[in-house]
């Protein structure tokens, strides 16, 4: 897939945060199959999951960056020059978010703001960058209606859910204030063989699979 930029043609590129998670891995495969050059944001040169990505997804080029550090995000965007950014990175353990509320807010909430600010600074009319934010059903928290829709009131009941609400509204704010192509998708619980075994639902599905086999 090529895309005309100022009269030139350039391979479409995408940058994925949360590349080591189940969604990041599957998304990378889909984009690669569509002809994209795929980059994955990873924190630290010695990240223990880097080897896994290099083995399982050899077509992904890992770049260093940290959702807690604006300058590192700017550097990552300047290096990758992506057409699209998919923000799947977060501290996604709801129970853990009560024990590490500040860290959860800093990464899962403020990390969205930093990434959008980096996109605003690096992108522009000549290099527009599209942004996708992975929002969560945890934003609904104390559910008032079933099923939930985009219009359902948000009532988070955990630091994780509150951080996701901040990221969700920040995405709207940057779209309306700066004209960025920024959107959110509200994700509900979903399982796959790539989901970490540390998640309760993954433990259940893994046990069922073992019994079946």
Segments predicted by a language model, with ranges:
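N-terminal Rossmann-like NAD(P)+-binding domain of SDR-like oxidoreductases, especially those catalyzing
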Residues: 2-192
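Charged, solvent-exposed alpha-helical segments that act as regulatory interaction surfaces
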Residues: 145, 210-213
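Glycine/proline-rich active-site loop of Rossmann-fold NAD(P)-dependent oxidoreductases
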Residues: 165, 190-206, 213
């Amino acid at each position: 897939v090529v895309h005309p930029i100022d009269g030139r043609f350039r391979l479409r590129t995408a940058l994925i945060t949360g590349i080591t998670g189940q969604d990041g891995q599957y998304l990378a495969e889909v984009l690669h199959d569509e002809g994209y050059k795929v980059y994955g944001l990873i924190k630290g040169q010695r990240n223990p999951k880097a080897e896994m990505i290099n083995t399982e997804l050899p077509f992904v080029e890992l770049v260093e960056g940290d959702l807690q550090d604006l300058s590192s995000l700017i550097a990552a965007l300047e290096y990758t020059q992506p057409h699209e950014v998919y923000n799947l990175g977060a501290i996604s353990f709801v129970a853990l978010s009560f024990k590490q509320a500040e860290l959860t807010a800093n990464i899962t909430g403020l990390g969205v703001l930093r990434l959008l600010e980096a996109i605003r600074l690096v992108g522009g009319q000549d290099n527009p960058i599209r942004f996708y934010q992975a929002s969560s059903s945890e934003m609904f928290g104390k559910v008032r209606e079933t099923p939930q829709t985009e219009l359902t009131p948000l009532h988070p009941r955990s630091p994780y859910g509150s951080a996701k609400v901040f990221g969700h509204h920040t995405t709207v704010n940057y779209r309306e204030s700066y004209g960025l192509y920024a959107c959110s998708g509200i994700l509900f619980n979903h399982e796959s063989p790539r989901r970490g075994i540390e998640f309760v639902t993954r433990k259940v599905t893994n046990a069922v699979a073992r019994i079946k086999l």
